[in-house]
Amino acid sequence: MYGLVVCLFGMIFGLIQYQGINKLPVHAAMKEISDLIYETCKTYLITQGKFIIILWALVAAIIVAYFGGLNHLAPDKVVFILACSLLGIAGSYTVAWFGMRINTFANSRTAFASLGGKPFPTYAIPLRAGMSIGMLLISIELFAMLCILLFIPVDYAGPCFIGFAIGESLGASVLRIAGGIFTKIADIGSDLMKIVFKIKEDDARNPGVIADCTGDNAGDSVGPTADGFETYGVTGVALISFILLAIKDPSIQVSLLVWIFAMRLVMIVASAVSYWVNDALAKMKYGNADEMNFEKPLITLVWLTSIVSIVLTYIASYMLIAQLGDGTMWWKLASIITCGTIAGALIPELVDRFTSTECAFVRNVVQCSKEGGAALNILSGLVAGNFSAYWMGLAIIVLMGAAFGFSTLGLDVMMLAPSVFAFGLVAFGFLSMGPVTIAVDSYGPVTDNAQSVYELSLIETLPNISNSIESEFGFKPDFENAKRYLEANDGAGNTFKATAKPVLIGTAVVGSTTMIFSIIMILTGGLADTGAIAKLSILWPPFLLGLLMGGAVIYWFTGASMNAVTTGAYYAVAFIKKNIKLDGVTKASTEDSKKVVEICTRFAQKGMINLFLTIFFSTLAFACLESYLFIGYLISIALFGLYQAIFMANAGGAWDNAKKVVETELHAKGTELHDASVVGDTVGDPFKDTSSVALNPIIKFTTLFGLLAIELAIKLPTTISVSLAVVFFLLSLVFVHRSFFSMRIAVDKD
């Protein structure tokens, strides 16, 4: 029950921050723009909600077949599992809506705060909004899981956890993928106008700008928030499944389950304490400063939270499991989680080395662009992405290796496959400062939108605006410094938007090993069947074929998601070029802006259908075809997906901040150098915000859904199973074909 109290504390913390941001001062012109962005986002999110329910019907059919037909659960219990899956969807959807709402409050308040002549409020408001999202997200997710654990009978809680996690994963997959497509169609459509018409960023006359602002929330707020909610849920379910399958002693099971949930409560406390301490330190240092490095206090917050979290992990472990095993298990398990916590702090630091405006790789992109234009800009960005994948992969390997080392110190007495449990705890440790990870990720869309709100409000052109602001709000606005603060803060936002992506994809990959182990336990009779275990090898051809197939699907997924962006952007650009009016108007018409939003929504929906249904039918096909082929497929998706996602996310981040350097430091807007940087940023848009980020929920959904699919498949007669595999595979090919040809741009005849 203490856990529920801590969850309520986290929710109250988030809601208090929400109310506080809503009450911050804001000029009417800026509030009008942020309200318009919110209304557009609301329409988009309602559309996606209807779409999620349609896809849920497909998943629900498999849940009914598995729990009702295969396991012969009573109808009322099957209905309750379905209700838990809907609860998972509702959780993802609710926190996504909350994140979108508070960010659309924060963007206009940040834009207005920049006029005060001091940079600190421009930093503090986006972070405050992010902490509100992070604390509420983790608290709601944990509250739901604690309710299942505490109030559902033990023999029935497992299926409810599975249903809840599948619902979370479905909601996150749709919102993350569709949001990623939407935002980059809008972003590219808006950005390319800077080259075509030589207009400034966020020019109010550009009909694509409102869609771009909507996309910042749909792709960089709604998607990541739902993704974060799902990540914490699925990682927890994977560990719960392992404990129930690999540990035979009920008393040890109970001790470890209590400990796991206590560690999740620790992350809430650690994040809240660290935020308050960091806020006080940042205020002392920068509160009255005229200049500040916006990245510095964010980096401090990440490391401070990791240190507090590690200390509390050891303290809580000693208090809860000091008597477990030989009396040393508490520090061994705490040390394994600490490996993940260090990874959660180290990965953002590594991301900073490849995407920050100050880093050597971004400076290399800028320098290459000066002589080689867009061609060398793109090549040097690819270099940054590839190098980042190496170093982040190495960091993850070293820390997983350390966790494996701890797992050899006697854990095998308590459980089967202790190394798998260790890897699951590493994934858990990745998330040990969850609210802060979400907060620094949410920082980016607010800073991006704040810049747009400032420009779209046309506040500098309003009659007698300086005197009006001084009269109403009590200060003289500083327009020049305001723009400079917003641009510099956006650079920090770009960097920290990039930091959460590898953390989340890392948890998907490391955590998926735990879920794959659950499938292996089913196939090998609890690791007792040596003949079955021998098939987990490249000496068993189906396993090798599965490894090859997983890589193929990852590369198709990358191409199909980018194609959805490319096609949508083509039509958005064509519409904007045809309808933009630059003479005699101060802003684009509402009708034209809505039309661009409509184009983005249409292609996001079409792309999402093809992507999700291909993954859905492929999972069923390979599970039905051959069990060990399916294991190879899952492993391959995780490994290929990890490096593809890291490479794409950081290459995109490097291109984005190279453009920021050209604009804010070199003041080269409107030059050939700027054009080259815009081209690079355009290529990077779907890299970092569509394909890479969508791989995280897809890996988790495939693994989690695969757990049901494989159990269904192995209990079917071989003839029926293979026949279904053929049918499902052909259906997947239909949507693979549609992912290009149904969205192909018509070729001009001339």
From Swiss-Prot:
Mg(2+) 1 binds at D187, D191. InterPro entries: PPase-energised_H-pump (IPR004131). Keywords: Calcium, Cell inner membrane, Cell membrane, Hydrogen ion transport, Ion transport, Magnesium, Membrane, Metal-binding, Translocase, Transmembrane, Transmembrane helix, Transport. It is found in: Cell inner membrane. The record marks R176, D220, D227, D689, K700 as: Important for ion transport. Its EC number is 7.1.3.1. It comes from the Bacteria. One of its GO terms (molecular function) is diphosphate hydrolysis-driven proton transmembrane transporter activity. The record marks K497 as: Determinant of potassium independence. It catalyses: diphosphate + H2O + H(+)(in) = 2 phosphate + 2 H(+)(out). The keyword Transmembrane applies. The keyword Kinase does not apply. Ca(2+) binds at D656, D681, D685. The chain crosses the membrane at residues 1-21, 51-71, 78-98, 133-153, 161-181, 227-247, 257-277, 301-321, 327-347, 391-411, 420-440, 503-523, 538-558, 607-627, 629-649, 694-714, 716-736. GO terms for cellular component: plasma membrane. Substrate binds at K184, K688. Homodimer. This is K(+)-insensitive pyrophosphate-energized proton pump. It comes from Chlorobaculum tepidum (strain ATCC 49652 / DSM 12025 / NBRC 103806 / TLS) (Chlorobium tepidum). The lineage of its organism: Bacteria, Pseudomonadati, Chlorobiota, Chlorobiia, Chlorobiales. The gene is hppA.
